[in-house]
Structure formats: structure tokens, C-alpha cells
Amino acid sequence: MKPTLLALALLLPLSVQAATDIQRWRNRDGTQILLVERHENPIIDLEVSFKGAGSVANPDGKSQVAEFTAALLTDGTQELDEEAFNAEADNIGAHISSDSNAESASASFRSLSKADIRDKAANLLNHSLTRPRFDEAVFRRRQIQSITGLQQQETTPDYTATRELTKLIYPNHPYGS
């Protein structure tokens, strides 16, 4: 009896994933759009992903360019400095962020799905992508944080081991740089 319950408990997440209805289409420009609807909570999560904008696109000898640029995207817009941008997001209870990985960069928001709140959050995200601020003071602060973070990582054996293993696995490839 217990092994059967354990097997069912382990398989349950797989059956839930398999039951997820993913709607797919492309807009006029060819952008692929995926939509998963769940109406249990009045929340919307939206993510815009840019394939090829990750760390594999970093210029030679300039690691962290993609990561740094992605982090700066949601630090304000041409109209709103970082503080005002964050205040606008906080006022509507939205979480707006950007990130990158090896293959892509992304920007996203989470907010209530109520139309006026959703539209304000989408507008903030849109402006951060189409009219980013790239404020000099924020850039310098992020630069110091990034350098400090990299220096701290260099002191951990697991980071050093992973970096060296990646170089061995992916010689002459951006993954290994």
C-alpha cells in the first residue's frame, strides 16, 4: 500500500503538467506566443524572452554584459527614474523584473489580472524595454554590486569547480568562457 501511495504522489506532478493546456500562436511579426490560462487566482504573469540575448552573446573578454544589461532594463525608464519606477510598480502591487541566462534574456511582470492594474503593469514593462533609462548612478551601483558578487563567488570552491568543469566540457565555446 505505501509504495503505491508513494508512486502516486511522485507521478501527480507529471499528470498535472501533462494536463496543462498551452495555447501557441505567432503574431504578424513572427513572434511566438504561448499562453497558459488558470483562473483559480486573479493573477497574471507575463514574460518576454529574447532568444540569443544571453551570455553566449557576450563579447570576447567581457563576461556579464548580458546579465548586467538585463538587470538594468527594469531600473527605470526615460520618464521614470529607478525610485519612481519602483514606486509605480509598488502602487499597483506589481513585480517587474528582468534577467538573463546562457541562451536568452527576459523581462517579466506579475500583477493582479484586473484590467486597469494589468494594463499599468504591462505599460511599465513595455516602457522599460522600449525606453530604458540606463541611469549613470544606477549603472555604477550595479557595477560595484556585480564586481563584489563576482569576487565573492571566486572564494567558493563549488563556483570555481563548476567554472573549470564548464571550460573543460565546452572548450572554444561561449559556454566555456
Region annotations inferred by a language model:
Residues 77-78:
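Extracytoplasmic
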